[in-house]
């Protein structure tokens, strides 16, 4: 297969060549959901954990990779889609961080159409909101592989299992957890014993 492309950069007299990827080793994943659900924070964590960045950017500090526009820094929300690439086990993943505000719905629609899969982000505090529902519906309408990530489970008043049940109602009975947050595993075991 033909490599995706080669980019070079001159740094202090040295020529640096970016890693080449064949088309089968590239994935485009849209992050979608309601405003303030945690999409940009999730993108920052993925970039940091993959080694693409050496620091974890914070929205409040105005130093995230995806929200670099002065208006985004001022508002502390994404107003346009941004691409954040990283390598994971030899696969190039292009994250498309889409805005969550309805004013910028075109960015969400474009990001989902451009991606091959969608990661809908749902806040562990707010639950399944209208923005998450719309993102899920857009992903289904465009026949995209879809996963849901529940963010902010570590915050007070977050209820992972309530949100899981709500997702089954709003997204369909095929919703099934792949990973349960560590802080919730003991709660579910306790609830199960209490219900016997």
Predicted features, each with a name:
Residues 13, 194-196:
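N-terminal cationic leader/targeting segments used for protein routing and processing
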Residues 124-174:
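Conserved C-terminal guanine-recognition region of P-loop GTPase G domains, centered on the G4
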Residues 46, 114, 134-138, 142, ...:
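Short alpha-helical scaffold segments that flank and stabilize functional sites
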Residues 17-122, 126-128, 162, 171, ...:
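P-loop NTPase switch module centered on the Walker A-proximal segment
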